[in-house]
């Protein structure tokens, strides 16, 4: 399975910066369907809690390699990616290997 993901959370962004990405369940469902159709993905999951928002997408490697989950999420929410890019943490998985950005104190970031 090929997966890319992105996360904006309290460790990199203030409450004010995260507000643009705060989502209620009905909006999450709407965005997931829109993203799936727009980008012809195999899968799409959005997780939104009080201190983080994540977008996980799945597609064939050839499709996924040209996609940025951060840009997709910003586009779907109509917020400028350039303004928020530095607050996001990317994740990547091709096949059986998963790569996270690891914080020096051994915490996932």
Segments (PLM) and residue ranges:
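N-terminal ligand-binding/catalytic initiation module
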Residues: 1-109
């Amino acid at each position: 399975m090929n997966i890319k993901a992105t996360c904006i959370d309290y460790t990199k962004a203030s409450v004010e910066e995260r507000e643009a990405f705060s989502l209620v369940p009905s909006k999450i469902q709407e965005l997931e369907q829109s993203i799936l159709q727009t980008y012809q993905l195999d899968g799409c999951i959005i997780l939104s809690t009080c201190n983080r928002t994540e977008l996980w997408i799945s597609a064939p490697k050839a499709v996924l390699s040209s996609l940025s989950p951060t840009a997709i999420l910003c586009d779907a929410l109509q917020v400028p990616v350039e303004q928020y890019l530095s607050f996001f943490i990317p994740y990547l998985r091709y096949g059986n290997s998963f790569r996270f950005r690891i914080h020096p104190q051994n915490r996932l970031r």
